[in-house]
Amino acid sequence: MGGKWSKSS
């Protein structure tokens, strides 16, 4: 959880 989830959140 980091770049990928940051964009989604």
From Swiss-Prot:
It is found in: Host cell membrane; Host cytoplasm, Host perinuclear region; Virion; Secreted. One of its GO terms (cellular component) is membrane. The virion-associated Nef proteins are cleaved by the viral protease to release the soluble C-terminal core protein. Nef is probably cleaved concomitantly with viral structural proteins on maturation of virus particles. Phosphorylated on serine residues, probably by host PKC. Its main location: host cell. A lipid is attached at residue 2 (N-myristoyl glycine). It comes from the Viruses. It is a lipid-anchor. Residues 2-9 are annotated as: N-terminal. Keywords: AIDS, Apoptosis, Early protein, Host cell membrane, Host cytoplasm, Host membrane, Host-virus interaction, Lipoprotein, Membrane, Myristate, Phosphoprotein, Secreted, Viral immunoevasion, Virion, Virulence. Belongs to the lentivirus primate group Nef protein family. The N-terminal domain is composed of the N-myristoyl glycine and of a cluster of positively charged amino acids. It is required for inner plasma membrane targeting of Nef and virion incorporation, and thereby for infectivity. This domain is also involved in binding to p53. The Z-84 isolate was taken from a 54 year-old Zairean male. Factor of infectivity and pathogenicity, required for optimal virus replication. Alters numerous pathways of T-lymphocyte function and down-regulates immunity surface molecules in order to evade host defense and increase viral infectivity. Alters the functionality of other immunity cells, like dendritic cells, monocytes/macrophages and NK cells. One of the earliest and most abundantly expressed viral proteins. Homodimer. Interacts with Nef associated p21-activated kinase (PAK2); this interaction activates PAK2. Associates with the Nef-MHC-I-AP1 complex; this complex is required for MHC-I internalization. Interacts (via C-terminus) with host PI3-kinase (via C-terminus). Interacts with host PACS1; this interaction seems to be weak. Interacts with host PACS2. Interacts with host LCK and MAPK3; these interactions inhibit the kinase activity of the latter. Interacts with host ATP6V1H; this interaction may play a role in CD4 endocytosis. This is Protein Nef.
